[in-house]
């Protein structure tokens, strides 16, 4: 299921905030997000279940939880504004909902950056059929 969602995004030509999130991740980590994070662990990419495999996967778990709290807009598709000032991401705009989405994405990108040293290539294309531990609650 995660694979189909990612492929659909790639084929459609990413619109709205998914492209913005990709740019944030690239800026913070230097990694290509689709290759490095789209299929990482049990939570990066579409959906998630089980227990996060490591700190990077936990970044995705927390990001999913952050999205669950957003109301009034579609976190995956609605466009938001942000800028980069002195290496920091600054979320802007007048819409509180899309600003909240931006803050979720910003926190995840920073989390990825802060956990680069523990990033494990073995989780880069981790099959979700191995995510069998009980699912944690947000």
Curated annotation (Swiss-Prot):
Free-text tissue specificity from the UniProt record: Expressed by the venom gland.
State the free-text cofactor note.
Binds 1 Ca(2+) ion.
Q: Tell me the first and last residues of the signal peptide.
A: 1-16
* Principal location: secreted
Under Gene Ontology molecular function, one entry of this record is: phospholipid binding
SS bonds (residue pairs) = 42-131, 44-60, 59-111, 65-138, 66-104, 73-97, 91-102
Question: What are the alphabetically sorted keywords of the record?
Answer: Calcium, Disulfide bond, Hydrolase, Lipid degradation, Lipid metabolism, Metal-binding, Secreted, Signal, Toxin
Q: Where in the cell is it found?
A: Secreted
Tell me which SMART domains the record gives: PA2c
Q: Any one cellular component term from GO for this entry?
A: extracellular region
Gene3D superfamilies, per the entry: Phospholipase A2 domain
Q: What does this protein do?
A: PLA2 catalyzes the calcium-dependent hydrolysis of the 2-acyl groups in 3-sn-phosphoglycerides.
Q: What is this protein called?
A: Basic phospholipase A2 PL-X'
Origin species, per record, is Protobothrops flavoviridis (Habu)
Print the organism lineage.
Eukaryota, Metazoa, Chordata, Craniata, Vertebrata
């Amino acid at each position: 299921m995660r694979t189909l969602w990612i492929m659909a995004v790639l084929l459609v030509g990413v619109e709205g905030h998914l492209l913005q999130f990709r740019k944030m991740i690239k800026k913070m980590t230097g990694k290509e997000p689709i290759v490095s994070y789209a299929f990482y662990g049990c939570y990066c990419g579409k959906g998630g279940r089980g227990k996060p495999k490591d700190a990077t996967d936990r970044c995705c778990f927390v990001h999913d939880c952050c999205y669950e709290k957003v109301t009034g807009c579609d976190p995956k598709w609605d466009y938001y504004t942000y800028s980069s000032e002195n290496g920091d991401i600054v979320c802007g705009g007048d819409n509180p909902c899309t600003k909240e989405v931006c803050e979720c994405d910003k926190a995840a990108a920073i989390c990825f950056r802060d956990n680069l040293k523990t990033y494990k290539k073995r989780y880069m294309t981790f099959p979700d059929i191995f995510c069998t531990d009980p699912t944690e609650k947000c």
